[in-house]
Amino acid sequence: HGGKNGFNNTYGKNQIGTFTLPESVIVCYQLLDTLPEDHYKDGLIELIKHGMIANEKIFNSMITKTSFNVDFEIIREGIDVKLKIVSEDFLEGDKRKLLNFGHTVGHLVEKDSNYEITHGQAVAIGIYYELLISKEQLGLPKEIIDSYLKYLNQIEYEYEYNFLSNSEKLIEMLKHDKK
């Protein structure tokens, strides 16, 4: 329901695309049970990201869970976070950039791994590194990072990544990132 449609090319993720709203969006929670586990976890990362950028209730609910199961109210709140941000900034002028949290580093991870790492896993890694940068540059409390890492450990998601490319190539990839 974000209206952003894109595809990858040799320069990176979502380099070609449009902003076009769908006529409708259907949410069928029962389909979540049919997803492979890694894709389900990718969705969990999207939810925790929404909690970190705009809804503390989602974040607190996610980090206190002891299972993968997420109640529908939290999913609905995650959808509402995205709808609110997109409705306020459809063409990604300013506020919508919040939804890119974790994506700058995440896109580097995806490209560097030749897309062998799922988008959600890459964003999870990206969030981790962007939190570390926020701690270093802005004084983000370590407790937020610890809570996030605890959650990633609970869902058995890796959060560290050893880049295969050298720093010059990574910088070149960053120059082509859509953001």
Tell what function each PLM region has:
Residues 73, 77, 100, 104, ...:
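Amphipathic alpha-helical interaction segments
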Residues 24, 55-61, 105-109, 128-129, ...:
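Short acidic (Asp/Glu) and glycine-rich catalytic loops that position anionic groups and cofactors
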Residues 44-48, 74-82, 127, 152, ...:
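Short alpha-helical scaffolding segments that buttress acidic/His motifs in well-ordered protein cores
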Residues 1-64:
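A glycine/threonine-rich phosphate-anchoring loop and its flanking beta-alpha core
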Residues 48-55, 66, 82, 89, ...:
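Structural signal for hydrophobic packing residues in well-ordered secondary-structure cores
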Residues 45-47, 139-179:
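C-terminal charged capping/lid subdomain of soluble metabolic enzymes
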Residues 64-116:
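Oxyanion-binding "anion nests"
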Residues 100, 104-144:
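Internal helical hairpin/lid segments
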